[in-house]
Amino acid sequence: MSGGGDVNMSGGDRRKGTVKWFDTQKGFGFITPSDGGDDLFVHQSSIRSEGFRSLAAEESVEFDVEVDNSGRPKAIEVSGPDGAPVQGNSGGGGSSGGRGGFGGGGGRGGGRGGGSYGGGYGGRGSGGRGGGGGDNSCFKCGEPGHMARECSQGGGGYSGGGGGGRYGSGGGGGGGGGGLSCYSCGESGHFARDCTSGGAR
């Protein structure tokens, strides 16, 4: 039955089976039919779901079978028992956050964007300057309630700030950047981008 198009082999009766495995990120997996036979390929586009289309391993499902253009059978119209929506993988759309979800927003340290896992993996989620707490805490001193530009702690400047730590642990290290002095004029209390004197050091 190869060639023209997909052919539905169900004959009206839905088949039952169990999910063998399903890769949420890649969007496909395999179902083991209850009545025996080979495992059937299933793509996320064939899943009936009220939200994110995924399947959980060992989940009971019902499905129709269709033969694709290359003659291989695959599961389609996959649902839970009695046509109910599938339970799916509890990880949802981001597979429980995944590496891409770690860290705060972009920019300098991720503090402002706020990620549930804090500084995360450096350049990926948090920007390049040290990660931050992810919960609006200062990336210089680690205390909540203010940003680094408002920090009263000297010695950090914009040169360090630590690694942010994994999962918001605060990290350690950080360099001594010379306090809160302007790089343009050397005066304390403002940064070069806010400098009005225009003088060079």
From Swiss-Prot:
InterPro entries: CSD, CSD_CS, CSP_DNA-bd, NA-bd_OB-fold, Znf_CCHC, Znf_CCHC_sf. One of its GO terms (molecular function) is mRNA binding. The keyword Cytoplasm applies. Induction: Down-regulated during cold acclimation. Accumulation during silique development is AGL15-dependent. Residues 14-81 form the CSD domain. Mostly expressed in shoot apices and siliques, and, to a lower extent, in roots, cotyledons, stems, shoots, leaves, floral buds and flowers. Present in shoot apical meristems and siliques (at protein level). Very low levels are observed in cv. Landsberg erecta compared to cv. Columbia. It is found in: Cytoplasm; Nucleus, Nucleolus; Nucleus. GO terms for biological process: embryo development ending in seed dormancy; fruit development; response to cold. Signal peptide: none annotated. Residues 89-109 have a biased composition (Gly residues). Keywords: Acetylation, Chaperone, Cytoplasm, DNA-binding, Metal-binding, Nucleus, Repeat, RNA-binding, Zinc, Zinc-finger. A zinc finger (CCHC-type) spans 136-153, 180-197. Belongs to the cold shock protein (CSP) family. Chaperone that binds to and unwinds RNA and both single-stranded DNA and double-stranded DNA (ssDNA and dsDNA DNA). Regulates the flowering transition and flower and seed development, particularly at late stages of embryo development, through regulation of gene expression (including MEA, FIS2, AP1, CAL, AG and SHP2). This is Cold shock domain-containing protein 4. It comes from Arabidopsis thaliana (Mouse-ear cress). The lineage of its organism: Eukaryota, Viridiplantae, Streptophyta, Embryophyta, Tracheophyta.
